[in-house]
Regions:
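C-terminal catalytic "cap/lid" subdomain
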Residues: 1-97, 101-358
Length: 358
């Protein structure tokens, strides 16, 4: 397997917790030892760690009558302190520091917040520090929540230009059939654009976490599409991280497309930030989706614009049937775009360098 200069490792709740939901210190310690060895070998590592709620559960008994949302907020707020203290002690044994990074979905949507977080990651990685990322459950509720930490890990991997995303769960990878059925086995490799195996995935979630294999498949394939090698493996297997870097492991590897620019990676993860919808004709769709020639979105191919936007805003692009084609950063506002719509010889609304095709 190719060498990776930068990794994002996501450790799921079922890897960090015992069957009773409390933290498994032995499992956490084993993974911390592997991460320390990887850093010692010269690879930068960002850790996305679940487990705060489980840590809180071991320390505090939530009063009766508390709502599910508030219960999660309280346990996470208490448990995050305990979780970080465990990591601090474990990494200190290797002469490493750890840094807490708590994120919300909004931090990845605003341009200023996004750049501030990215610069913080880059600064931390220059030193002997392991950034440890978790969702800020205290303020993340309902629509502001990530699907789970798999989604957060994918966003961090794209933001930091990581070469690989490793998602550790309590199973060996994606299976070709539901567990226990004849012929069920781990799918070793999946191309970034191959969705054939999605129907084989059992639609269930983990015991203590929010996500499941459907989510992992979607996140892994999206990361692979923007050029990030993505691996789903069993975090409870001995030396799993070391084995992955050696290329000798049990798990599912999503084969990546050619790596995209940082701008295109950001666009790929920002559907929710789009300010308006731009509809295009079949000719423009063919040009934009061509793999032989890079094309920008020209006004002559635009048929309709819904909503208003300014220069620099992200717009969602749809074809004549209303199916999503991609996202792009507008070079001018919607007023000018409506004036230019359908005309030849006008400047591109979205330049190819600022265009992501889904």
């Amino acid at each position: 397997m190719a060498e990776f200069r930068k990794l994002v490792v996501k450790i799921g709740t079922n890897v960090l917790a015992r069957e009773d939901g409390l933290l498994d210190i032995t499992s956490i310690s084993h993974l911390a030892d592997q991460i320390a060895a990887i850093k010692e070998a010269g690879t930068e590592v960002i850790l996305v760690s679940s487990g705060a709620v489980g840590a809180g559960r071991s320390l505090f008994e939530v009063p009766e009558g508390m709502s599910k949302v508030v219960r999660r907020q309280v346990l996470s707020a208490i448990g995050q302190v305990r979780l970080m203290e465990i990591y601090r002690q474990l990494f200190a044994n290797h002469g490493l520091f750890c840094a807490q990074v708590l994120a919300t979905k909004e931090d990845f949507q605003g341009h200023t917040h996004y750049n501030n977080m990215k610069n913080c990651f880059l600064a931390l990685l220059r030193d002997k520090v392991v950034p440890i990322v978790n969702e800020n459950d205290v303020v993340s509720v309902s629509e502001l929540m990530f699907t789970d930490n798999d989604e957060l890990a994918g966003l961090v991997a794209a933001m930091t230009n990581a070469q690989a995303l490793i998602i550790l769960s309590s199973v060996d990878g994606l299976l070709s059939a539901p567990p226990g059925e004849p012929g069920s086995q781990v799918i070793r490799e999946i191309p970034y654009d191959d969705k054939r195996w999605l129907k084989a995935i059992t639609p269930s979630k983990s015991s203590f976490g929010r996500g499941g294999m459907h989510t992992k498949f979607r996140i892994a394939q999206k990361a692979a599409k923007v050029g990030i090698t993505t691996i789903i493996a069993n975090g409870r297997r001995a030396n799993i991280l070391s084995d992955i870097l050696k290329g000798d492991f049990i798990g599912t590897r999503f084969l990546p497309a050619e790596s995209l620019s940082n701008v295109k990676k950001r666009l790929a993860y920002h559907e929710s930030e789009s300010k308006a919808a731009v509809y295009i004709n079949s000719g423009a769709e063919t040009a934009l989706c061509s793999t032989e020639k890079a094309s920008s979105l020209l006004p002559v191919g635009i048929t309709r614009i819904e909503g208003d936007f300014q220069k620099g805003d992200i717009v969602r692009i749809f074809n004549a049937e209303g199916q999503p084609v991609g996202l792009g950063q507008a070079q001018y506002g919607s007023d000018t775009a409506r004036q230019y719509m359908g005309q030849q010889g006008k400047r591109a609304l979205v330049h190819y360098d600022y265009l992501y095709i889904e």
